[in-house]
Regions:
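An acidic, low-aromatic, low-complexity terminal/linker signal
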Residues: 1-196
Length: 196
């Protein structure tokens, strides 16, 4: 099987997983949404807060504490910083700031990698910092609007406004990343013939 055929198959699996999740979500519409919560892992990219659904998270690694080396690869898109060897498994590491065209300062100081799993594929996302797990009430999550201007709405699965105080006058907007959309777009970019 050629590399391009293998990558095409992975893209198909990601799309299939996204369709299955969408179908399952449709079945839950109309249930008591007010009492349901969405468990996410919060993190920072370029001083902005984002989140990923916790069920996609395989693990969170620190390259220094876990003694992980990111090995760079020739001939790959700029956003792929390299690969890591995690207990014998080779995992690609994507710099989300470069992928989303965000400011990429302090790259040498970044040590946090969120390992996500989707459609039997594991990928690492290089992020500035990880804030931990949070529960967002489903009724408080809004569809992606223009509030988050730095990332295309195609890559967002919603926004959550976290109040800084009881008056709700200062709220932090947290963009919820659509993992399937990111991985599908990333795979499609790799399949396009271009000079890296």
């Amino acid at each position: 099987m050629t590399n391009q055929t293998h990558q095409s198959k992975k893209a198909e699996l990601i799309i299939e997983a996204a369709e299955n999740r969408a179908s399952a979500a449709q079945k839950n519409v109309g249930e008591n949404v007010g009492n349901q919560e969405r468990k996410v892992v919060r993190f920072t990219l370029s001083q902005e807060e984002y989140a990923i659904d916790a069920h996609f998270i395989h693990s969170i690694r620190d390259t220094e504490q876990d003694n992980l080396t990111i090995f760079s690869l020739p001939g790959v898109p700029e956003y792929i910083v390299g690969v890591i060897n995690l207990r014998g498994e080779i995992i690609s590491v994507i710099n989300l700031k470069v992928f989303f065209s965000l400011p990429n300062e302090n790259q040498g100081e970044i040590t946090k990698i969120i390992i996500v799993e989707c459609a039997d594929m594991r990928v690492g996302f290089l992020v500035d910092s990880v804030h931990g797990i949070a529960d967002f009430p489903l009724s408080d999550i809004q569809s992606s609007m223009s509030t988050i201007e730095k990332i295309k709405s195609d890559y967002l699965d919603g926004e959550y406004f976290q109040a800084e105080d009881s008056t709700n006058s200062n709220a932090t907007v947290i963009g919820i990343i659509d993992i399937e959309a990111v991985l599908t777009a990333e795979m499609e970019q790799r399949l396009q013939p271009s000079a890296y």
